[in-house]
């Protein structure tokens, strides 16, 4: 996606940049930064957007995303028979977040405000700007605990028609041909300028030009220095998911041992640099030990960035086994509790788990996260989408991983499957009898219409929802049924993704100091601010909330900065 708005070249020498003036500087050209820039430009202010990557990377992580949005009591939900409400969504959010620290004051305020937004103007505000929504609503993070615990009580995951690129383009279009908006790509901020207890600008390094494709690592060779001044600086630079050193440094003790093997769900430039830079300028950083990493990562056979992993978005039917071949405990079923599963895995002493399933399940229940893995949705090709769903066999991108992925094995018998699993590199040899016992016990539970097995009960409950029955969840059946074969196993890795803590802000996205007062002139939005306040999600997320958090906090930052400048 190329910008056609007024755009600086990728490398502008410091002397050439000195004459540029702006009312506000936005650090980061991802979704939160673009939304903030739109709000500033709409109010007639001059905006300079700085980013360390080239113009191919405008939109940041949002461009790569599935485009999922958390909406409450939407027309899409109601058409599918889902009865949602603000009260139910807030109950789910607070039960999931489990705020329990003194520093959670502002994150909890943001949580209330965000649920208000999701249940109120979020859909209409985005629709007015061009958002189109796929009609089926997904059910992510189903929980499985009590009514006040973690999880979505109802489906709320709304997919942008066109996925991440279409969502990014909504705000890119607003910035096109605006003479008051300038981009400075390959400009890496190294320092926030603080004068008289206020942030008044930025200093940094001009990096050599890069023509690397989106997401690929780029050079950090310096070709100059820069300094820009403005009345407001908005930090919207993303989290730490591409920086495994920082992920490990901030790994929470409650989550067990630090994984030795990690895949990256985000490009290397998601490095978290600006969190430390803002902290040095006086910003309070809270909840750095809260993070969101997926447990269903698979190695990308065609990587774009280092250790590139793709997340499986699973339906609920696969049998989930740990590295020793033992079934994960209730309610750690596919798609129910990401962080609970992560904690179990890290405390097991291993960094991987297994899905055991069959062709019938993978055909309907495997989706891959990311716009590039969903060409029908991303390309807004309805005919292709309908054909792929009606066609026998898995969607094309899933089939490609079955054929080429290093983490997939298949066989006609369970004994042959376990033997193939044991042939994969870096695995603890599985005992066939242990795996067979788990599979056999599970298969006995599908003979009747009732069951004591929590996963089978959850599958049947899911199929009462039309969206799941039609397009997401297969009818319970024996994994070893020859008609559903062949059997398939997938080795699953831990995949880095989101930073849930970050720079502390008030509801106007003003950055706060350790004493709780605003650091004048500085604002933060998106993942660098924990998607709002320094951690709007608390310990866990409900999904569809990360893009929405960037939009909501970016909007707040743009409006807050504009108000203060005026």
Curated annotation (Swiss-Prot):
Binding site for FAD: 23-54
UniProt entry tagged with the keyword Oxidoreductase: yes
Required cofactor names: FAD
Pfam families: FAD_binding_2
One Gene Ontology molecular-function label: steroid dehydrogenase activity, acting on the CH-CH group of donors
Keyword Glycoprotein assigned: no
GO biological process: lipid catabolic process; steroid biosynthetic process
Keywords: FAD, Flavoprotein, Lipid degradation, Lipid metabolism, Oxidoreductase, Steroid metabolism
Gene3D superfamilies per UniProt: FAD/NAD(P)-binding domain (3.50.50.60), Succinate dehydrogenase/fumarate reductase flavoprotein, catalytic domain (3.90.700.10)
Residues of the signal peptide: none
NCBIfam families reported in the protein's UniProt record: PRK12834.1
Protein name, per record: KsdD-like steroid dehydrogenase MT0809
């Amino acid at each position: 996606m190329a910008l056609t708005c007024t755009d600086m070249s990728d490398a502008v020498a410091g002397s050439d940049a000195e004459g540029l003036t702006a009312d506000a500087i936005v650090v980061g050209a991802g979704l939160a930064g673009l939304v903030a820039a739109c709000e500033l430009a709409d109010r007639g202010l001059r905006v300079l957007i700085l980013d360390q990557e080239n113009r191919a990377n405008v939109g940041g992580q949002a461009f790569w995303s599935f485009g999922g949005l958390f909406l409450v009591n939407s027309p899409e939900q109601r058409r599918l028979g889902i009865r949602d409400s603000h009260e139910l969504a807030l109950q789910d959010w607070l039960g999931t977040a489990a705020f329990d620290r003194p520093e959670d004051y502002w994150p909890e305020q943001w949580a209330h405000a965000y649920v208000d937004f999701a249940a109120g103007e979020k859909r209409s505000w985005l629709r007015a700007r061009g958002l189109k929504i796929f009609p089926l609503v997904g059910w992510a993070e189903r929980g499985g605990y009590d009514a006040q615990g973690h999880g979505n009580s109802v489906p709320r995951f709304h997919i942008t028609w066109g996925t991440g690129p279409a969502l990014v383009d909504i705000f890119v279009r607003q910035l096109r041909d605006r003479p008051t908006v300038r981009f400075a790509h390959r400009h890496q901020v190294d320092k926030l300028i603080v004068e008289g207890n206020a942030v008044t600008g930025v200093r940094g390094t001009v990096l050599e030009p890069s023509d690397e494709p989106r997401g690929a690592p780029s050079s950090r060779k310096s070709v100059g220095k820069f300094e820009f001044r403005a009345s407001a600086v908005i930090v919207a630079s993303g989290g730490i998911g591409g920086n495994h050193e920082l992920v490990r440094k901030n790994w929470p003790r409650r989550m067990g041992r630090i994984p030795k093997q990690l895949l990256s769900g985000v490009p290397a430039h998601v490095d978290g640099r600006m969190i430390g830079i803002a902290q040095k300028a006086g910003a309070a950083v809270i909840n750095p030990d809260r993070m969101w990493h997926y447990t269903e990562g698979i190695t990308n056979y065609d990587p774009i960035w280092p250790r590139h992993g793709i997340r499986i978005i699973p339906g609920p039917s696969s049998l989930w086994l740990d590295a020793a071949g033992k079934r994960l405990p209730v309610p750690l079923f596919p798609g129910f509790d990401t962080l609970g599963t992560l904690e179990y895995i890290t405390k097991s002493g291993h960094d991987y788990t297994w899905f055991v399933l069959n062709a019938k399940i993978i055909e309907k229940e495997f989706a891959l996260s990311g716009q590039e893995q969903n060409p029908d949705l991303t390309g807004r090709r309805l005919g292709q989408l309908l054909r792929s769903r009606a066609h026998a066999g898995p969607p094309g991108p899933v089939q490609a991983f079955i054929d080429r992925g290093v983490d997939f094995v298949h066989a006609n018998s369970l004994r042959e499957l376990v033997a193939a699993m044991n042939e994969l590199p870096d695995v603890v040899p599985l005992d066939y009898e242990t795996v067979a016992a788990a599979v056999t016990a599970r298969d006995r539970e599908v003979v009747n219409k009732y069951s004591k097995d929590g996963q089978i009960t959850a599958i049947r409950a899911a199929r009462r929802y039309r969206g799941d029955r039609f397009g997401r969840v297969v009818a319970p059946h024996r994994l070893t049924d020859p008609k559903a074969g062949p059997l398939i196993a997938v080795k699953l890795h831990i995949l880095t993704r989101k930073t849930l803590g970050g720079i502390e802000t008030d509801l106007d996205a003003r950055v706060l100091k350790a004493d709780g007062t605003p650091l004048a002139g500085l604002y933060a939005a998106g993942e660098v601010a924990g998607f709002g306040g320094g951690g709007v999600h608390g310990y866990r997320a409900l999904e569809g909330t990360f893009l929405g958090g960037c939009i909501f906090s970016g909007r707040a930052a743009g409006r807050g900065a504009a108000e203060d400048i005026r």
